[in-house]
Amino acid sequence: MQHSSMKVDLSNFFKDERRNSLVFIDAAWNNIKDLQDHIQNLFSLKDISLLTSDGCYLPPRESIKVLNSAEGLKAFRFASHDSDTFVSPAPVKSSKKRKNRSVEEQVHLTASTPLRPSKRSKNQNNSEWINIAENPSRVRKKELLDMAPGPSVQSKLLTNKGTPKAPETQTEVSNMSANIETENKESAPQIKNKSKNKKPTKSPEASDQVENEPAPKSISRCTLKEGKMSESKNQETSPDILSEKSGVVTKENETREEQQDKTHLESNKIPDKLSQLKAGDQIEKSPGIAASLLSISFRSPLLEMPFNVPRIFQFPTKKQQIEILEYKKLKPISPRFLLQKGAKSDDTAKQFPSNGKDSTLKPKSYEILHDEELPDVKDKKNVSEGIKRAVAPLCEDIIETSTTLPGAIGAVESAYLDNSTEAETTLPSEAEATNPLELTESFLQNNTSMEKTPKVEKILPDDGSASPIKNNVDSKDVKTVTVPIFEEQLVSDSDDDVMLVDDSNIDVSYGDSDIEPIPVVENRQSLDIIRDLLRTATPLNSLPSRGDTVIFKLLKIKGNANSGTTEFVAGRCTYVNRRTKIVTVETITYPPEIGRMLRQYYMSGLDESSEDVRTLSIHLKDMLEAKIIVATID
């Protein structure tokens, strides 16, 4: 056979790119066993067998020439491992008595719970059997279920007694090595005398493998029929115990296979992350489906970022400059500004529109258009009330310095229908505005509805030779303007909003007046008490005690050292808090001018009282120049 290569399917062992591999076949090889060893060395595998691509099994002892007709190979592992893993079970005991137990019962296993040796056993100190347990079992959990040996010594003893205890598991048999077999052969004549059952014969494949292999492993001596019987019996009696004892073995096998896979990945320089992602994404399927499907890996960049690092998102900001679209000049609405403005405009006035046209009129002389005679005002008190009411009917139109009433404007327009000129009006002069008699002529004597009567209008002259124009206005055609009462409060005579009061009838003589000045009387008694207490006072260096009399000064503004200090205040300590250093003082006397400053130091809840509150709550550091009164003995 010449040198060649062949495709090998390793999907039973790997889920990544190694599941389809190409293997070199050397012509110097004799049988299939050499090819199996070569694949095991390449991929760090153990106990594999080969099949052809059409499903034909290749025995290990078969010649290598059979591969000429094969298109491809597939590697797998037997579930039972009859030829490599197992040793024949221990010989059956011949007696049911406890004292005649065989030596095989003292084999110690590597289990999760310690196995206690039998107390009545004669061979407790047999070190040869205990050292065998150092070799851990390499059998998987699935393989243990399939490779059940014949009935063991312990299982027959328990079934004969009728107890529900579980028989010896397959892990006990799997731990026996070739040394056990040789020792069993030496002790065979002794066991034959005691046992009544027959030994199971070796299989031909197992015997050939023992002769050829340099370091043979355990050999199975049970037939297929006995294996099936023991398997069904073990599944009925104790499946849970079997899974628990074999759990440790399967974990060791899985960890070794993972280490082998990692070393192989490092040698081939394949990233570990890619292999783990692809292996996790794919589901275990049949060999044909697994070979046809492609591995798909999903990646999320957000999941790869550290979770504890904050992410800052920057959004573009649009800055718009402020644009001035329109300028508006607001004029004051306060009546006091209007009066000042009207007083300054003695000789100038603005035109007002009429019928949608602006025209100018230049009268040449001053003339009173219409003046109604009103009864004289006799009472001077009504004069002061008339002054307040005269300014009240100012409306929003007065802002433009037009003071003509609607009735008067209509009368003037009707008088000049033939001409294209109009009259121009202004506010009365400053002298006329301050004259109370002229202002009150526009009001009736008993007018209580705050309605204004027609007012006299004046025409500004531009030429001295202008003819006088008179406009007779009927009282029925004049529309009165109602002034709300609340507008009286907005009108004042000065910039300081001080109302004008007529005090001409007040008697200034102090003899007949009831108003008398009150002399300020200084409280000398409190000063005398404090002066007497200072004679026997000593500086206060620590917290006073309850009942002590103290003299101290306080800041005029609490907490402000630059505000200055008050005069001395005398008081008696009623409570002292040693922890917060706050002293409650009941005042004895203090200067009357600092009574308002003491409100800052009043106790909470007492500052709103109408009584003379004298209890203060003061911190020790707020007592300035504090002194304590020492009682003297006469």
UniProtKB/Swiss-Prot annotation:
**Superkingdom, taxonomy of origin:** Eukaryota
| Disordered as annotated region, ranges | 87-135, 149-276, 342-361
Compositionally biased intervals (Polar residues) = 152-181
Q: Any one cellular component term from GO for this entry?
A: nucleoplasm
Bias (Basic and acidic residues) ranges: 223-234, 251-272
Q: In which tissues is it expressed?
A: In egg chambers expressed in the follicle cells, nurse cells and oocyte. Expressed in the larval brain, salivary glands, fat bodies and in the somatic hub cells at the tip of the testis. Expressed in the spermatogonia and spermatocytes, and in the adult ejaculatory duct (at protein level). Expressed in the adult Malpighian tubules.
Protein function: Component of nuclear coiled bodies, also known as Cajal bodies or CBs, which are involved in the modification and assembly of nucleoplasmic snRNPs. Required for Cajal body formation.
What is stated as this protein's family in its record? Answer: Belongs to the coilin family.
UniProt-recorded name of the protein:
Coilin
Organism, scientific name: Drosophila melanogaster (Fruit fly)
